A protein has these predicted regions:
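C-terminal structural segment of proteins
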Residues: 1-330
């Protein structure tokens, strides 16, 4: 049986209280984690993956639960996205493909966006990691080498495998952050860091409060396609979101493409999408776009499927996600 290491649970009732607790822990030089739904953090704690002595629960921070068409709180549950009548249908579809019904009842939007990167050598029990002389991402105190790209201890290539980010990136979402020193916001496309250990631009003591989506998001159509081992459970081995906008003509006047499950960050493929718009030719342009996305992604051997297969499937997923472009032009 995998037992969680002991920790102190803090249960603030407001955002200000949560940030104050975080600030006090920092001043005392005590490490901590935020916990939202706990569907990722708590299993990692059972595996003794970077566990902390203090955990701050956001379950009672009501400011983070708001859900509107243009505002999605960090504590909104995934099943709420699926069932909502105001959420963009492509975002609702992506949410419906996350894990299982039970996990979607607990998992949150903020937790999915900030999902820890995953790797075959990292997401294992402590005994398993010890048997292969530890892992660079978790067991840094052992001076362990990276098991995916050996002989370098500067970069972690663990894979980002969350589903919501590519759709939200295509919807031009802005992510909003808060800490005891103030608030800030940035485009979601700028939030992620190309390192499996750093992961994103959250500073110590900072948390995600909500995401905002432009009011014109309803004008965008699209789809999200996902490759996984089991349809009812697994993280994406590859995921592709494609969104487009028309002005009553056959050719789209804008296209956005984003990917997940292929690198340490979700990819936003603006140049490939814009190139596809030039001299648009329906199916041929879609085939060219799909091939350019396949060439752009750089998966490594740290998930169940091989990098070559995931790249090939990225091309197929892109074509599938673009199917609506051909239907709309008929």
């Amino acid at each position: 049986m995998m037992r969680m290491p002991p920790f102190t649970l803090h249960t603030p009732a407001s955002l200000d209280e949560a940030l104050e607790i975080a600030s006090n822990l920092q001043d005392a030089e005590k490490e901590f984690d935020w916990v939202a739904g706990g569907t990722d953090l708590l299993p990692n704690y059972k595996w003794h993956l970077n566990s902390k002595k203090n955990v701050i629960s956001l379950a009672n921070v009501t400011e983070l639960f708001e859900l509107k068409a243009t505002h999605i709180g960090a504590m909104v549950r995934l099943h709420e996205l699926v069932e909502s009548e105001v959420v963009h249908p492509v975002l609702a579809k992506a949410a419906s493909m996350i894990a299982s019904v039970l996990i979607r009842r607990s998992g949150t939007v903020g937790g999915n966006i900030c999902l820890d990167t995953r790797c075959y050598w990292f997401n294992q029990s402590e005994d398993w990691r010890e048997s292969i002389d530890w892992c660079h991402k978790c067991d840094c105190g052992t001076e362990a080498d990276c098991r995916v790209i050996p002989n370098q201890n500067t970069l972690c290539v663990a894979t980002y495998q969350a589903d919501l980010a590519p759709v939200l990136m295509c919807l031009d979402a802005t992510i909003h952050l808060a800490s005891s020193t103030g608030t800030r916001s940035m485009q979601l496309t700028d939030f992620f860091e190309l390192d499996g250990m750093t992961r994103n631009k959250l500073q110590p003591g900072e948390l995600v409060t909500h995401l905002t989506i432009p009011k014109d998001s309803a004008q965008w159509q699209g789809d999200y396609q996902k490759l996984r081992q089991r349809e009812s459970w697994d993280f994406p081995e590859a995921g592709v979101a494609v969104m487009w906008k028309r002005n009553g003509v056959n050719a789209p006047n804008d296209i956005r493409v984003a990917t997940t499950g292929l690198e340490s960050i979700p990819g936003f493929h603006q140049s490939q999408a814009q190139h596809a718009l030039e001299d648009w030719n329906g199916k041929e342009s879609i085939m060219s776009l799909a091939e350019s996305i396949r060439k752009a992604v750089k998966p490594v051997q740290n998930t169940w499927y091989t990098p070559s297969y995931r790249r090939k499937m990225t091309r197929i997923l892109t074509k599938r996600a673009c199917a609506g472009l051909l239907e709309d032009s008929k």
